[in-house]
């Protein structure tokens, strides 16, 4: 019985693991697309806070998906959220030369591991 309870708990908690949002921001000279894959952020907090960026002057679209789509030029895996015990994977799409500043930010500031798929 205990094994079934644990299995059901894992199954129920997988909802947090299968939660992501694709954020596409357009501006005058800026076009950014990224996807945040939730690791351990409470579902409502992730949906209402992390996936709703406040970017004045930008047109922002957010699409909620089960997992980040393929095609990223880089992924900051297990990125730490400042001043919180939460982690996420951040997938970057678009200009691969952005790796020059995204990789150091990922590894130093976010304490994540940079992966180039």
Give the location of each predicted region.
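N-terminal hydrophobic targeting signals that begin at the initiator methionine
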Residues: 1-2
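Cleavable N-terminal signal peptides
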Residues: 5-6, 16
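Mitochondrial intermembrane space
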Residues: 19-117
């Amino acid at each position: 019985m205990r094994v079934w309870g644990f299995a059901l708990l894992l199954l129920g908690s997988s909802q947090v693991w299968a939660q992501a949002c694709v954020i596409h921001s357009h501006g005058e000279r800026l076009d950014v697309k990224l996807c945040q894959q939730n690791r351990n952020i409470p579902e409502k907090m992730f949906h209402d806070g992390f996936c709703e960026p406040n970017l004045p002057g930008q047109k922002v679209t957010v699409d909620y998906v089960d997992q980040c789509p393929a095609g990223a030029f880089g992924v900051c895996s297990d990125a730490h959220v400042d001043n919180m015990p939460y982690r996420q994977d951040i997938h970057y799409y678009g200009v691969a030369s952005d790796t020059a500043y995204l990789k150091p930010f990922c590894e130093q500031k976010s304490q994540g591991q940079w992966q180039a798929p």
